[in-house]
Amino acid sequence: MRPILLSGHERSLNQIKFNRDGDLLFSVAKDKIVCAWWSANGERLGTYNGHQGAIWTVDVSPNTVLLATGSADNTVRLWNVKTGECIKVWDFPTAVKRVEFTPDGSRLLAVTEKRMGFLGTIAVLDINYEDLEAQAEEPSLRITCTESKATVAGWSYLAKYIIAGHEDGSVSQYDSKTGEQLENVQAHEFDNLISDIQFSADRTYFITASKDKSAKLISSRNLAILKTYVADTPLNSAAITPKKEYVILGGGQAAMDVTTTSARQGKFEARFYHKVFEDEIGRVRGHFGPLNTVAVHPNGTAYASGGEDGYVRVHHFDKPYFDFMYEVEREQLRK
């Protein structure tokens, strides 16, 4: 499995995202630019320029018409994917740490930072596709996190709920129409922040990654913890693979905690776990520094990781990856 190395950022990666078709990959880093790449061969399509600070988050609409980014310059920007022009800028009082479109692309959520006397919020913006220039000025819904700020958030199936991961290690479920909190579960160890949340293809369950060195598979409906994957290093990102029953975890010691430069020492590898049996089944090395973000191709044929080293590595899976099975799984097939 030879990786394609994408070198377009000068600083560490924050988030990478495939579009729904999987032919494009978008990456954002601490260097103010958004890069778009062909996922098949790693060719760079272009960049989206305009942010004045580190870009924390990116998402692309389901129809690949719009791109949303959230940045440390306290704005959410909406871009035309094809032309690269910035269509709309929404200003917030603090930095924006996560953006995500609903499964139908009609709404966009933005998670804002708790800072300078402002509480952390989750804002929901309505998106207009009829006239791209005419976007709403104000959020249609604002959820304020009075207890622990939200660090990440996403939409459940049918955009019925907003699921948020918090700084204190808890996961919340909000009604996406009213903003009312319906559930709150202490999914991870107290005060170990949730660094990533990614959903299954049908959005009925999701995976969280946390600084407590574990990832959890959780139901969107009632926040029941279905599976736990234990790693030996703080995790920055986790993703669920379609086609095969695996999950991919990415992490590594924080850059400031690393005392030796050996890549093995810092545990800078993508880890593959069996989704059902919770066993670790393999690792993929390569990054020089922690993995900050992992993403899986929607067809399950490839995955990409973005690291503290400023590189995005795209791995297209080989045949053995798809052939690998537990004895139990083989028996099921024989039946």
Curated annotation (Swiss-Prot):
It is found in: Cytoplasm. The keyword Protein biosynthesis applies. Its main location: cytoplasm. Keywords: Cytoplasm, Initiation factor, Protein biosynthesis, Repeat, WD repeat. GO terms for biological process: formation of cytoplasmic translation initiation complex. WD repeats lie at residues 8-47, 50-91, 145-184, 189-228, 286-325. It holds the Pfam family EIF3I. GO terms for molecular function: RNA binding; translation initiation factor activity. It comes from the Eukaryota. One of its GO terms (cellular component) is eukaryotic translation initiation factor 3 complex, eIF3m. Belongs to the eIF-3 subunit I family. Component of the eukaryotic translation initiation factor 3 (eIF-3) complex. Component of the eukaryotic translation initiation factor 3 (eIF-3) complex, which is involved in protein synthesis of a specialized repertoire of mRNAs and, together with other initiation factors, stimulates binding of mRNA and methionyl-tRNAi to the 40S ribosome. The eIF-3 complex specifically targets and initiates translation of a subset of mRNAs involved in cell proliferation. This is Eukaryotic translation initiation factor 3 subunit I.
